[in-house]
Structure formats: structure tokens, C-alpha cells
Amino acid sequence: MSDSTFSAKNLACVRGGRVVFAGLGFSLSAGGALVLLGPNGSGKSSLLRVLAGLLKPAHGLLAWNGEALAEDPEAHAARTHYLGHHDAVKPVLSVAENLRFWAHLHDPHAERAGRAVDAALSRFGLARLATIPGKMLSAGQKRRTNLARLLAAPSPLWLLDEPTTALDKASIKVLEDVLAEHRAAGGMVVLSTHADINMPGAQELHLDQFAVAEELP
């Protein structure tokens, strides 16, 4: 992965007429990580959607290598992997089929995508569940399937909303190792969490510090 930078300056978000946060900023370079902290309703999920390009900020600038994301939203979508707090596991597809769907969207080369899927299944302990349909999975198994998409369809920037939800300690350790390897390869991670997760050197952003009481002008 290239030596890139991802930055936000003076970001503000408005949802339903309410200013969720304002004046927010950060800067990440290759290998960097940012943990979003704050109570429910402080805007962690909204910020992740803004960073993914799924929600337009009310104010402020998002930039990749100094270039505004608004200048090339398709390029930003291609380098970003966003996982929301709801698991996007298709119930009628098997675990392997779910991952193949995402892998082929990322890489149309069937053999290469297949190898990525096999590696993702193995890494997240899903190989024995590969043929099981999504509707039969437990909450933890669905979460691991969702997280396995990160390896099946790799991208430089990972945006993760509460990735440890429904995971046991062993699965959290696997996730921590995967995050560390991604960062060591030059990738970036932004995640929200209510749980402890080991990401050495990660920055912290407390969203309640950017709450405002009045409407933006």
C-alpha cells in the first residue's frame, strides 16, 4: 500500500436538523489508526458514514493525499472498506458465497478472488461453516463473516462500526492481529467501539468534545 494520508478539517454533521458534531478534525498517515469514543448518540456512526462518503458533511473538508474527496468520490469508494454495525450477511447465501460476492466485486479475477476468500475463511475460523447459509449463523458467526470481507476484498482504508460486537475473546484477538497486519502493510483503520481493543499507537477521538448546543449558522 502506498504512503498515503487521510485527513478531516473542521467537519460538521447535521442529522434531522440536529448538529451531531462540529469542528472535528484529524490526520492519519499510512499505518495509522483512529479510535472513535463517546456515548450513544455522540455521532460515531454518523462520522464513519461521512468518512465513507455515504453521508455528506454539513461543513468541512475530507482529503486523501491533500485532494478533496468530493473531487473523486469513486476513487475514495474504491479504496475504502466500510463495515456498519449491522452485519451485511445475505441470509440465503452460504458463508463462502457471501465472501465470494464481495471478493468478485473487488477483484473480477476468479482464481485470485477465490484464494482471497479461502484465506479469509481460514483466518476468521469460518472454513467449517463455509457451506452454511447466512440465516443459520449465530450473531458471532455473522460478525466474523462480515469481518472476513476485509480480507476477501482488501482495501487501504478500513472504517469499522463496533467491530467487536458479538465476538468472543478469541475472535477479538484474531481481529486485533488482522488490524495490526493491515497497519503494518501501510493500511489505515478508523473504528468505533465500546470495548477494549488492542491497537498500539492508535489515536483517540472523543466525539462528545465536538458536540454543540445550537444550530450552525
Swiss-Prot record:
Disulfide bonds: none annotated. Keywords: ATP-binding, Cell inner membrane, Cell membrane, Cytochrome c-type biogenesis, Membrane, Nucleotide-binding, Translocase, Transport. GO terms for molecular function: ABC-type heme transporter activity; ATP binding; ATP hydrolysis activity. ATP binds at G38, P39, N40, G41, S42, G43, K44, S45. It is an enzyme of class 7 (translocase). One of its GO terms (cellular component) is plasma membrane. It comes from the Bacteria. It catalyses: heme b(in) + ATP + H2O = heme b(out) + ADP + phosphate + H(+). Gene3D superfamilies: P-loop containing nucleotide triphosphate hydrolases. The complex is composed of two ATP-binding proteins (CcmA) and two transmembrane proteins (CcmB). This is Cytochrome c biogenesis ATP-binding export protein CcmA. It comes from Paramagnetospirillum magneticum (strain ATCC 700264 / AMB-1) (Magnetospirillum magneticum). The lineage of its organism: Bacteria, Pseudomonadati, Pseudomonadota, Alphaproteobacteria, Rhodospirillales.
